[in-house]
Amino acid sequence: MQNQQQAKLKGRWLVLADLPAVMALLADEALTQAAGLTLAPDPALRQWAVSNWLQERYLWGLWAGAQLVGVIATFPQAEAEWALGYLLTPAWQGRGLMTAAVATFLRANPTLALVAEVAATNRASQRVLKHNGFQLLNQGAVCTYRRGRD
């Protein structure tokens, strides 16, 4: 069953035409908070920011048919490193789908040096990172993981 569900999810870079789907997904405050994503409270400012992210190719979408059910985001950091974040709608969580989606993303983008910060209480997200070769750098209330750079 899990492999069938993974096969139903398709990943690709999101483009400006995907803006309505991305905005609908990010409108779920509980989902964005659980992912540690802080968005502007002003809807116009939020839409402007997401439009810029789409134009810069920072968002990779996870699609179940025509429905956007998740996002993997990368944002440039200092010293040629990228911050990684991801979120998946609750209906699709708990089945290893994000682990598989991150693996697919990494295969499609093998040269990215990535760092991810995860709440210590978010064990599922930590498993996603560990299963995809991320190494724990710092542990506390927020755990920091890195992949692809010594």
What role is predicted for each listed range?
Residues 1-34, 59-150:
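Acyl-donor (CoA/ACP) binding surface of acyl/acetyltransferases
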Residues 38-57:
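Active-site rim helix/loop that mediates acceptor-substrate recognition in acyltransferases
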